[in-house]
Amino acid sequence: MNASPSTIVAIATAAGTGGIGIVRLSGPQSVQIAAALGIAGLQSRHARYARFRDAQGEVIDDGIAVWFPAPHSFTGEEVVELQGHGSPVLLRQLVARCIALGARQARAGEFSERAFLNGKLDLAQAEAIADLIAAGDLRAARAARRSLDGVFSRRVDAVSESLTRLRIHVEAAIDFADEPLDTLGGAQVREELTRTRALLAQLLRDAERGRKLRDGLHAVLIGPPNAGKSSLLNALAGSDRAIVTDVAGTTRDTLHEAIQLDGFELTLVDTAGLREGGDAIEREGMRRARAELQRADLALIVLDARDPQAARDALGDAIDAVPRRLWIHNKCDLLAVAGPMDADAIAVSAVTGQGLEHLHTRLRELALGDGIESVDGEFSARTRHVDALHRAEQHADAADLELRYEQLELAAEELRLAHEALGEITGKLSADDLLGKIFSSFCIGK
């Protein structure tokens, strides 16, 4: 255990009023501070009714106190939770009294940080706590719960253990450099590395899916002015989120709206119409539209169904940045007769609703069917996890190449770097500044 000398305190429930509010203490003085509040006779993991008193003996609040002795607590330290009424005034007064008795205000994420430092959970699990709290839909919440339960970490550990075995074999071969690699089990090393690279590649694919589950997909509505992008966003969102007029260039800024697709969050981004010219404000809107495209997972290209080819030509190469695209011919209700349709386009009318069900189906297929389908054991992941796995994969591939030419020292270094990248995910090889950045994004009471 990495015991901390100080005792910390914070409100553990969400901001605002509620039926119940919780103040959490963690550290060696937790029980003594509780006693000074007037809470005597605490028993391990037993709820005890008490009145919480100030320095003059006046009652601050009454409620339940629970003691979790070390190391059998969330943080691994002595923990006392004070459960009273959810009044921010009373909770702040209770925290102030605890501070007067020797505790200090906890930093953001400090309870989870202590749990990590005391070996109660690893870094990926600690991050999953924040992801679980912030989950925007049920699937994201379930994925975060699996990461908190260690599903992601165990798979990282499995690859890490395989890399450890490989490093042992390669380092041993370096010590016996006069012997050919094949006489030292070179074939088995290459076979193990091939298997490890396959595990790593699959883990990377699953982590990419986990990142999308956590962050959702960003779909940018792009197209020329007056193609009906804002009307389409309103139709998909089921509310009038964007201003709609007959004047081309009405949309000047980006507008984000989240919708749910079978329990998966898709963020729609309405953007300014792309065209030549325009005033300074409209040109800034078009610049922002192109910037959104650079970050998009999916481009919804909205064209006027009455002349889609001309609208396509007006876009130029703006959509080349997004590999996944869905062509939408809007305003199909204004066609006197059905015109020629591109094979890859969907005809809709944002005004009448024609074709919207087909569009919803196609969006679900793109969002859920391409690497986002529901699978057993899916877990939550973050961009930093995906980045670390990418680097681990690159180093493992480089190690394979070095082994082919029997460059053992170079192969050993590449394996070490791959191992180090994996260690960043669970926190086994993380710099202090990285830990500080991660935990500072947590809630104060976590």
Curated annotation (Swiss-Prot):
Cofactor binding notes: Binds 1 potassium ion per subunit.
GO cellular component, one term: cytosol
Single annotated GO MF: GTPase activity
Cofactor(s), by name: K(+)
Location of the TrmE-type G domain: 216-368
SUPFAM superfamilies named among the record's database cross-references: P-loop containing nucleoside triphosphate hydrolases
Superkingdom as given in the UniProt entry: Bacteria
Binding site for GTP: 226-231, 245-251, 270-273
Enzyme class: hydrolase
Residue ranges crossing the lipid bilayer per the database entry: none
Record: residues binding K(+): 226, 245, 247, 250
InterPro entries: G_TrmE, GTP-bd, GTP-bd_TrmE_N, GTPase_MnmE, MnmE_dom2, MnmE_helical, P-loop_NTPase, Small_GTP-bd
Keywords from the named record: Cytoplasm, GTP-binding, Hydrolase, Magnesium, Metal-binding, Nucleotide-binding, Potassium, tRNA processing
Subcellular location(s) per record: Cytoplasm
Gene Ontology biological process terms from the UniProt entry: tRNA methylation; tRNA wobble uridine modification
Similarity section: Belongs to the TRAFAC class TrmE-Era-EngA-EngB-Septin-like GTPase superfamily. TrmE GTPase family.
Protein name in the entry: tRNA modification GTPase MnmE
